[in-house]
Amino acid sequence: MAPKNGTVQEKKFFSKELNEEMTLLVYLPSNYSPLYKYHVIIAQDGHDYFRLGRIGRQVEELLSKREIDRSIIIGVPYKDVKERRNTYHPEGSKFSAYKRFIAHELVPFADDEYPTYQIGYGRTLIGDSLGATVSLMTALDYPNMFGNIIMQSPYVDKHVLEAVKQSDDIKHLSIYHQIGTKETDVHTTDGNILDFTEPNRELKQLLEKKLSDYDFEPFDGDHKWTYWQPLITPALKKML
């Protein structure tokens, strides 16, 4: 029997950190009940994870098989490619404000609106490319607020590597790290062509030393949703 479909709620609220109205996409599973507590999956690139990643469908199927704990998804869409870079890139003009938005505004919103666990292990950050970057960097800034990070082909630069090196209070984090073996010539949104594989290997070496629960999953593919979509399920099964 095919799993039932949950519901997607569109929630709007004004972010003081970003000084703009934010739209959130909240996925509640088909058997959602306020009588139970739920893990919260916070997805950067919210529209992409729902449409291209089909994350709602994958969570629903895992729940129907009882392969993950009860979970809701909060997707944070981006307005356009330029705005995405400004908020997700370590050198972006809104990067710091966006991290504060996640920690100081989105998390309290989720805890107020839904029956969540309200502790770090009950929150998972997930993102692809730059979305994975800002997920990791947010968790490094707020290590007690988040317990799990799923990184799909993260963009890694000197800022990311240095942040990991300087982070001493992250041993408790659980990280699932995916990168394609063919991501050697990735066309970025600012017009450059970058090798993602070598920086991710450097990141792997650092995280292996820092964490007790770290999974590195190379896959035979490149920087596309074609490869990321089927890799969401195994990551969720491990983290939830």
Curated annotation (Swiss-Prot):
Domain of life, per UniProt, equals Bacteria
Which InterPro entries does UniProt cross-reference here? Answer: AB_hydrolase_fold, Esterase-like, Mycobacterial_A85_antigen
Do you know which SUPFAM superfamilies this protein is assigned to? alpha/beta-Hydrolases
Q: Coiled-coil ranges per the record?
A: none
Mind telling me what this protein is named? Uncharacterized protein YjcH
Species annotation: Bacillus subtilis (strain 168)
Instruction: Give the taxonomic lineage as stored in the record.
Output: Bacteria, Bacillati, Bacillota, Bacilli, Bacillales
Q: Which gene encodes it?
A: yjcH
